[in-house]
Amino acid sequence: MTEKKTAPSFQFMKDESTSVLGGEWVPMYCTDEPVEFSKGDFETAMLNVIREPNINSTAILRADILAEKFYDLEGNEQELSTDDKPVLSESLPYDADAKLVNIDDITTRKELIENKELELTIVKEFVRRMIPRNPYKDALINQTCLVYNSKKTENKDTSLVLYIPHFEDEADCPFYIPHVQKVAILLHGGILSVHYIPYAGQSEDLRKDNERVVRTAFRLLQTAYKHSKGVMQGYEKRVNHDQVVDRVLFQDTYIQLKKKYSKFLVDNWAESTDPKKHVFEDLAIAAFLLEFWKTQYGDDYKTTMQFRDMGCGNGVLTYILISEGVNGVGIDARKRKSWSIYPTEIQRHLKEQVIIPSILLRPTPDVRRYMPYLEDNGAMFPIKVEDGLIAPATLVYSSADLIASPNVNICEFPDNTFIIGNHSDELTCWIPLLGFPFMVIPCCSHDLSGKKVRFNTRVPKSEKTTPAMKNNIKINSNNVNNSNSTYAGLVNHVEYLAKKVGWKVEKEMLRIPSTRNAAIIGTDNAYAKEFPTPDIYRTIEEEGGALTWVQNTMQLAKASPRNH
């Protein structure tokens, strides 16, 4: 039995006065033994880190690649593949209040490596713009990233990655990058190491392992090692974001929304829950929706569509969307304290109503065909009442009563309505069955009667597919995960229901501070004008019916609000 190889330790090189790179370079950390991954693994990992600098710092939102060139060892420029060509954002995520440092300088900065024994030459060069999460606190900067290889055969496995920020003044160095002039990560002789060129008078600090800049060097080495080994082992991302909405567009909109609304919402939070979690989550969802609607309905979407936020809870999402000029309504069975903090015009768009889909109250299409004058199905719904009575009693509501009640929303909306289900609990499985384009972010598992239930993940068998499912061909295969967890089962079940009644489903793993971040989206259904279709009635029946939905949703109106 072979022993499992342990990872090398990282050695602080404080007693070494000179770097293998020569010149002003100061060695910081290195592995104490040769690494097991190859130069190719290292460069693949580091190219990903160049494009995704948020891997190294949570204060960084992303990097925009402004320039990119590849060369052979003789210095001849190589043609970039389509995937490698940089795509610049037309809109920039900042305004007059944002901090900017020399961002007009997009000229690549070169660095000559003085150690002639290495004979290093540039094979890849990038200029990237670093976008911090808060550009009103941390400055945007440009930075050159260089990849060197050796011309010498004996150093064919040597690779160097070098970072040079586009400013000279030490005072301009933002918090989210190492506080030094230049950074190098070197793979040479199987040893992985990190080196700095310090600012004037900084060399002494680089010998103290409790200094932040020294700890940063350790983390840079740790990240380079971890990600290179991951490439070697064939690691693949479990979650792919940005399948539906472009990442840059989403993040730029998120920055703007956060600046406009976060302080007011956090400072005036009226609930007992953590304001930052809810506020920043809903800001991100709003940013996603605004960009999605723009691609779906066009630039004039604010005048051509409207939304209904079903189970809107604290109303934050509704508040942001309406404030951004989108017409819509937030609906919830219970009014929240937070509703009172919003302007009067927003409060008018927040409705305290129980939601009872009209399919439970209206005659079926077959009945209406023979009796078109009928407005309700004549159903009776007994509701037990105990509060304030001498003895428990039962109220009986008719479907006609519920249709006429201003305290009941029966989901009969204008044709241009888009439905949002943001952690809408009992409503989650109902939303794809209402006949309107939708986005639902599942959270807690309930069936169509409103009862808690656990769904198993499943793939519908071909012999059980409905005509609507056969017509549904646009399925995003991005899975939540492969396990049969309660959440994975719920997400899978919502997708199943949506496809079963004809929706062409897309799925996005939203960039929100929540582990329950799967968004199921349906905008195209060949049967939309025929709702409610036979498939919907059949689906409700196959799901066990919804006989107690009315009773459960009435009880929901009396219960205390849940917090997610």
Curated annotation (Swiss-Prot):
It catalyses: uridine(44) in tRNA(Ser) + S-adenosyl-L-methionine = 2'-O-methyluridine(44) in tRNA(Ser) + S-adenosyl-L-homocysteine + H(+). InterPro entries: tRNA_uracil_MeTrfase. Signal peptide: none annotated. It comes from the Eukaryota. Its EC number is 2.1.1.211. GO terms for molecular function: tRNA(Ser) (uridine(44)-2'-O-)-methyltransferase activity. Keywords: Cytoplasm, Methyltransferase, S-adenosyl-L-methionine, Transferase, tRNA processing. Disulfide bonds: none annotated. One of its GO terms (cellular component) is cytoplasm. GO terms for biological process: tRNA nucleoside ribose methylation. Its main location: cytoplasm. It is found in: Cytoplasm. It holds the Pfam family AdoMet_MTase. Belongs to the TRM44 family. Probable adenosyl-L-methionine (AdoMet)-dependent tRNA (uracil-O(2)-)-methyltransferase. This is tRNA (uracil-O(2)-)-methyltransferase. It comes from Candida glabrata (strain ATCC 2001 / BCRC 20586 / JCM 3761 / NBRC 0622 / NRRL Y-65 / CBS 138).
